[in-house]
Structures are given as C-alpha cells and as structure tokens.
C-alpha cells in the first residue's frame, strides 16, 4: 500500500494520465510501494521532482512499418521504441514482435528494464521496443522484408552509444540478423554493440542463447543456498513456456539436480513424470517450430492438457514461470502453495499478478522477482557489447562464469537491500530498492533540465 504522500500523489497523477495502460501502472505501483523506506530517507528527491521524472519515459517513438507479403500485398504494422531512462548508460532492452504489443506494455517493460539493468552493475539504461507484427506463419522472406522496413525507420534513433536493442518474444537470431544487416547498409558502418543477440560470425557472444534461463537458475540456486541452506538437488520443478528462456532454464535446472516435469505453450502444457525430454523439446521448438502437444504424442507416459493456465496445478517444489506477464493469478498461486511449492522465481517479465505475489509472501514462499531473477539475458547482452568494444570473443566458460557471478551478485544486492529497507528476505522490495538507488543517485548527480 502507498502511504508516502509524495509517492501517492505521483502515482495518482500517473494513473489519471495512463488509465488505459494497466501493465505499466501495475509495474510502477509495485516499485513505488517497495521504495517508500528509501524515499522517506531522501527528502531531496521530492524537491528535485525525481519520481515524476523517473516514471515518465525520456522518449517514445512510434512509426509505421509498411512491408510486402509473398502475395505482393502491402501490409502495415506499427513500430515502437520506448527510450525510458539513460541515467546510467545508453538505453538497453529488447524488441518484441507479437500481436499483443502496444505502447502500455512496452512502457511497463522499459520501466522494469531500467531497474533490471541497474541491478547487473553494467552501464546500461532502460528501454524496450517492438511491433504488433506476428512472425508466426510468415515465410523467411516476409520476416526479412518486415525486419528491413522496421530498421529503416528505427536506425535513426539507435546506436552503440545511444540505444542498443536486442531480441525478445518473436525476435530471435534470424530477426536480429536481418535488422543488423539493414542497419549496416543504411549507416555504412559495422557497430557491433548497437544490437545484441547477433550470430557468432558477426559479433555475437557465446552463452547468449542460454543466458536468461541459466541466469534464472543461478539466481534461484544462490537464493536456495543462502536463505534455505538447500539446492535444486532432488527437487521437482514446474516450468511454463517452451521458448528460449524455458528451454535453457530446464537444461540448467536438470544439470543442477532438479527434475523438470512440465513445459507449455499458449495452447496447453505437457506433464512428464519421468522428467522432460529436453533434446526432443529443442528439436520440436527450435527446428520444427511445432506445438508442445506433439510431445505427448511421442512420449507414452506424458499427458497433454489443453489449458496452459493449469500448469500451476501440478505438484512441485520449485516453480519457474517463463512464459508471459500475469500468467499466475491468485488462484494459480494458491494452487502452487497447496501442492507444496516453496520457491517461485520468475523467468518471464512480471508473470505474477500482485494478488499472486501476496499469496507467495503470506505463505513463506521464497519469491525471486523478474527484474532480479531474469536479468541474465540483458547481463550477457552487456557482456556481448563489452566483447564488441574490445574486438575480442570470450569462451563459453568465461561468459558463463561472468554470468553466474553477476546473478549471484544480484541476489546478494537484493537481499542486502531488503535488510536495509526493514523487509529482510523480501527480494521484491530488495531488488526494487537496490535498482532504484543507483538510478536515483545518477539522476540527482546529472541535474535537472530546465
């Protein structure tokens, strides 16, 4: 609950101006509620209008994206780039291609990205972008033409010292490659650091593909060790999603001794009591781009349920939501607790509703919020930018070791900040406070633009 008058006034004004952007308001409210103890210690923030500036993006770019499909028909989509905050570095955040993309969702993601990037300790500001274009069902040539048209407008707003996008939902290595190629043609320059998630032959980083999923498990393992004197060993793990984050979270959780029994997509989920056959899922999703229900057709002990929301009714010790925002509501959280779940760490962005988070906290569940637990992807993007700047390529083991160190550092920064805020063990409060303080200090030092 917001009790600080200054923060309440800022939020109420924001809610009036952004009434049609519920995801953005949800993200802002969560942060403002968490940072109340910090703001009360710094009355100078109010005088400087710091919070008012923090919750408004520095810039929002909206543009049309015309492209020609394989039938020769002209299609038009809408493109966005939300450049949220550059206090600690150039804007950094992914591009999402999905029909659900709108300005409110991208503002929420850019706002979250600001604090997530701060937690990594790397010099990266917050941003997010994308389009309502749906790459599913499109040919490679259609995707290429769209990506080239998208970058033909976006290129004038980005650069390695200005704004450095990456991939996200619907934007993988194929799309990043097409966009990088178009940027190179338009600018007549090879700026490796202006776009991350690149192929290994033109400046990409080893371990980038695995980074978000691996990082999620490194964070979870460190939290288990330090807060519960426990580990993944022998634990039953439920994972939602079957994209990049879910696949590599499954791989690392299994490597650390857990047994992953579920994966899902937007149509439903599969349950395999023997543990998920990850090699099959990789081939299904990364090569054939098939649906998860095909898993049950080839694995006799597996069952398929045509409702992805029911994945949270499966008994487990650890839940790793890796699909999409607000996928766990109050009822799903209660089902998890009832069935023995004691740890929830988030691989997706804001996958738990505020009501679900209340259920976790009131039942003693170890809760790792997205901005801390899934920061491995952007952390490794930052490491990719470092390699590009050095004109070097690090080994998989070197990148993975740096990633592990960053994720363990994020846990400790979040835990220590939770103690300082009077909420020991509440990693949501801790992550918000730790991420906020670095950004706030930088903003105060850089002055106010009149």
Which functions belong to the PLM regions below?
Residues 2-27, 223-224, 335-450:
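Adenosine-phosphate binding glycine-rich loop
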Residues 22-25, 43-48, 121, 158-167, ...:
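Flexible, glycine/charged-enriched surface loops at secondary-structure junctions
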Residues 44-73:
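Structured beta-strand/loop patches that form or line metal/cofactor-binding pockets in enzymes
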Residues 98, 117-233:
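Glycine/serine-rich phosphate-binding loop and adjoining beta1-alpha1 elements at the start
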Residues 162-166, 190-194, 239, 262-265, ...:
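General beta-strand structural signal in soluble alpha/beta enzymes
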Residues 196-199, 204-313:
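Glycine-rich phosphate/diphosphate-binding loop of Rossmann-like nucleotide-binding domains
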Residues 268-367, 372:
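Rossmann-like adenosine-cofactor binding region
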